[in-house]
Amino acid sequence: MSKGEKPWGGRFSGHTDKQVEAFTASIHFDKRLYRYDIEGSIAHAKMLARQGIISKGEGTTIIKALGEIRKDMDRGNFAFRDDDEDIHMAIEKELIDRIGETGGKLHTARSRNDQVALDMRLYLREETTQIILILGELKNSFLKLAKNEITTIMPGYTHLQRAQPVSLAHYLMAYWEMLDRDGARLRECRRRINVMPLGAAALAGTGLPIDREYAAKLLKFPAVSHNSMDAVSDRDFVIEFISASAIIMMHLSRFCEDLIIWSTDEFKFVDIDDAFTTGSSIMPQKKNPDVAELVRGKTARVYGNLMALLTLMKGLPMTYNRDLQEDKEPLFDTVDRVKSCLKILNAMIVRLTFNREKMLNDAAGGFSTATDVAEYLVKKGVPFRSAHGVVGRLVAYCLKNNKTMDSLTMHEFNSFHGEFDDDIYACLTVESSVNVRNVTGGTSEKAIKERIREIESA
């Protein structure tokens, strides 16, 4: 096949406009699928030869040439052209140039429709596996960090207002739990990715005696698609992956938001290592948390990729439409962004320095043990709603008189409720507040250690 000749050109009397070739070409981005395209083609050739659709000699010739093409591409010695259209045609044209008409037999019982669906599933199966591993490394870093901070007490927040004292380890383990669910979503997503569409052909299957199960075995797919129309038009496996990725990025972004806030002079809870910050071109004193900010910013790109795919798919008639060419760049971008953000965060968090003294001091402020005082009254038999009202009035009294609860006299306590006794003062420490919450999933030292033991023994 000559470089300018189209594999579908038999029906046409004229040449494709050069502007159309440039407009419709996807080779500049889908060439990253070359390994998967060749892997699928080798399996397809083996199956065709096994079924007697092509001769064994032809199969051997095709497979050898495909291996050589892959080596050239691996080395960067392959010249891609716009008039190749896409990665499938680039490889097929090169194959025919090298081995002649025998190369034209490779596309027997196959369409680019099922071919590209196969390439994307092979690609995404591999990338999902890699992301699961990288995610696991970040989870482990959170776990190790938490084990070192079990006794570190910090203020917990709701509405970004100080709420109750918590262990820093409890905070860090919250992100471990989020990332653990993220990994579970990806593993479940990978299960649905791992279905082979090859053999669906254009949309209706093929009348040739192919063996889809054999091809699936070669490509390590545990199942083949059950509906050829679904197989070539389905991109929900891509959407599901990007959706799972968007949730991962949401979790990373929330953590980065906290780091950005905590690293300010107003909070001073954490110092981000200089290696992960930058300065200002005009203000010499600045130390900016650019890495954390960029993770937060790149989250928007992944969200945009998800909406792009949902919008792309929502109005497509069955089955394949050229619109589906636009699914690859959002997918590739999502894969790249998620991997880079997971890796950079993993490198950054192991070098964080927490200001334990500042966290402890701030944990005691803002009447953070007020709930403990209410629960103290509950233990004395006071209904919770009544206790809530009593403590609310106590807080108002302290604010009006510029006092803290631990500075109140017993007489002042008793003026609000007669059930207060000297043991109330023990409830007012942040250490007591943290460790009394010894329920499953609570912030006490004992509960955190138990959860870590569960994780490490699983």
Annotated model-derived regions:
Residues 2-205, 210-216, 278-279, 290, ...:
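A helix-coil-helix interface module used to build multimeric assemblies
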Residues 41, 88, 92, 238-241, ...:
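Short runs of predominantly hydrophobic/aromatic residues within well-ordered alpha helices
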